[in-house]
Amino acid sequence: MTMTLSPEHNGPALGAVLTDDGCTFALVAPRAERVELALVRDDGTTIRNVDMTNDNGTWRAAVRGVVAGQRYGYRVHGEWNPDAGLRANPAKLLVDPYARAVTAGVDYTGPIFDHTAESYYEPDTRDSAQSVPLSVVVADSPAPEPIARRLPLEQCVVYETHVKGFTIMHPSVPEHLRGRYAGLAYPAVIEHLTELGVNAIELLPIHQFVSEPFIMGRGLSNYWGYNTLAYFAPHGAYCSVGTEGDQVQEFKNMVSALHRAGIEVILDVVYNHTCEGSHEGPTLSFRGIDHKGYYRLTDDLRNDYDVTGCGNSVDTGHEEVLDLIHESLRYWVTQMGVDGFRFDLATTLIRDSAHGVDQNHEFKKRLAADPVFDGIKLIAEPWDMGPYGYQVGRWGRGWSEWNDRYRGYMRDYWRSMAHGVNELASRVAGSPDIFDNDERPPSSTINFIDAHDGFCLRDLVSYDGKHNEANGEDNRDGSDDNRSWNCGAEGETDDPGVNALRHRQVRNMLAGLIMSDGTPMFCAGDEMGRTQQGNNNAYCQDNQINWVHWDLLDQWADVFATAKRFIALRRSSPLLQADDYHYRTEVTDADGKGLGRYEMAWMNGYSGEMGEADWNDGGRRLLGKYVSNATDEAFLIWFYSGDQPVEVTTPPVPWGTGYRIVASTADEGELPTEALGPQADFTLPGRTVVAMRVTVPTTRAQVDELEGITTAPADAAQDGPAEQPQQDATAEQTPERTAGSAQDAPAPQ
C-alpha cells in the first residue's frame, strides 16, 4: 500500500513511490524557480540529474529503472535573499521531507551551510552532496501485525524507554542485536516487560535525527534524538542490518513482536522544530526547500523565531507544514503500526502566530476529523518556551497531557516538603482541579515523577543537586529545580541505612504513581535502580550514563517486585483504573438504597472520613484514598510520607467489614498479614504506601445489621488525628485549595 494524501490534496503521493517500471518523485516547493532530482551513489557522487516539472508548486518527476535502495536528493533553485527569508541554494543537496529512509551521518566539516563562513548574506557555492545524509527509495511492505485490542489510556501502564539504551547492555540479547529495533523485539526483553506488567512503551524519538555540531565538538552525540531530520524515516542507526531501507522492515518487525505480547507502541515525536537549528545552522532539507514556509521567522524575516529553545520553530500556519505533519502521523499509524504519539513541546504546533496559542488550531481539527486516528493515543507535552506556552489542562477531549504538577508535588510529598495533603488528594485522584473540564476524564493526565528529562527515580533519592559535568558545560546546563533528597549522603554510598531508605523511597514513588487515578508513566530501568550518576540533562550521553544496566536487577529486586505487584493490582480491578471523577457519589444496592459509603472518599486514619481540621493541618502526612463500587469490591490506599511509625485505625461500618493488605512498600514483617475488621488498629511504618482490599456490605439490610453490631465509639470524632507530625520548617506555603479541601467538600468523593 502506498501513501495517500489528505483530502485537501489531490494527485500522486509525495516523496518517492516505486512503480512497475521505475519511481515517481514529488516535492512541494512553492517558492522554487527550478528543482533538480539528483540520483546519487553511496558516496554522494551524482549518477544523474533530472529536471522536475512544476505542478502548481509541487515538483514532479518519473524516472524509469529506479529500484529500492536508490539514493537521491533535491537541488532547489530560486531567490537568495536572506532579508526576505529566501534561502534557495542549489549547491546544497537536500533530504526529501517525505523520504521513508535516510542514510546516517553529517560531516560538519563539509560545506553543509548555505552561507559562507565570512557572511550570512553570501551563499556558499560548494557542493554538499558528499557531506550530508541521502534519501533512500523504499519498497512498500505489509504493515505490522495489529495489536489484538488497543486499550484505553486508563488501562495502560506506560514505560518510557530508548531503543538503544534499553538493550545495549542486555546479556541475553545477541550482541549484534543490542541497541537495535530487533533487540527491543528480542524474547528476553519482551519477557521483562510482560513480567513487570507494562502494556505500552513510549519510545524516545526514532525519526531519523542527527547530532548538533556543538555537541559533536565536545566529543559527544545527541542520544535522546530530539533533533529530527526526516519525519517518515525510522532512525537508521537502530537497525541491525543496514540503512538501505532495511530499518523500515526491522521497525515493523519490532512492532509486530510487541503487539503479539500485548504491548502498544507510542512514539515521542518532534514536529515543533528540526535539526537545522537557527538561520545560521546547516542546510540539510527544509531550509533549502522553503525556509520561509517551514519556519516561523521574526517580523523582519531575517531570523528564525524560536519558541522551542532549539534554534527554530516550525510554522503550522502554512499548509505545507500541516500536510507534512498530518501525513507523517498517518503513515506511522497505517504503515508502521504505531498506537499513539507523544508530541514534544506541543504548544508550538498550535500557535496562530509567534505570540499566540489557539486550542482550536487547524492541526488539532485535522486529527480530530481523520478516522485514521480513532483510538490512537494523542499525548501533549503541553508547553513550549514562547508567550502563553504553558497550556497544561487546556488541550480538551481526545488529548492527554504530561502533568508536571503531579511530578513536582509528588517529589515534594515523598521528601516531606509538601504542606498538608490537600494537593495530594487532587493529584492521586486524577488532578480534577486541572483536567475536569470539557467533560475530560482522569486519563487525560499522564502522571509521572520522572522522565528522560531530569533525574531518574534512583537519582531523585541519591542526589541533592545535579552533577552534569560530563556534558562539558561546567554543570551549568540542566534544571536546578530537582525537588530531590539524597537520603543522607550525596551520590553513591556504602551506608546500609541510607541505601535501604533509598530503595524504600523508590518503591514509594512507583507504588504511589501506580495507585493514582490517571495514566501512570515511568522510565525504563526505574524498576531496577538505573542511575545517571546525578546527571539530570543526559541528552548527549550515548554511554553507560544513560544505558540500562541489567546487572542491577538482582540488587534492586525488591523494587522490581513492588512495581510488579502494584501494577498487577491496578490492572486487576476497574476500580483502580477508573476513568471518571467521583464527586461524592453514594453507592447503592440493587434496590437503589444507599449503602452509606461513596465511590471515593478520603480517610484520616483515626475516625473515618477526613474532616475540616484534617484538611487544614499543614503538618499532615497521612491520607487514605477509598474507592468502592456497588458490588462487593473496594480498596483503601494509604499514602504516608512521615518518617516515624503511626497508629492507624481502619474505617468503621459501612465503609467496610474487613481490610486485608494486598500490596505495600513496607519491609517484610512490618505490617499485619491477617485481615483486619472495622475500627481495627495497626501500625503503619514510616514512608509507606499500603493497598488494602476491603470487604463491603452489598445491601442496605446488611449495613443496618452490621451497624447495630459494630457501633463506632461515641467519642471517636473527638479523639483527634492519630498522626499529627510537626510541620516541616521547610514546607511550602499552603497551596491553593484543591478538590480535597473540606470547605468545598473533599472531592473527588
List the model feature ranges, each with a label.
Residues 157-159, 201, 265-267, 341, ...:
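Hydrophobic faces of well-ordered beta-strands that scaffold small-molecule active sites
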Residues 162-338, 345-369, 434:
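Substrate-binding/active-site clefts of carbohydrate-active enzymes
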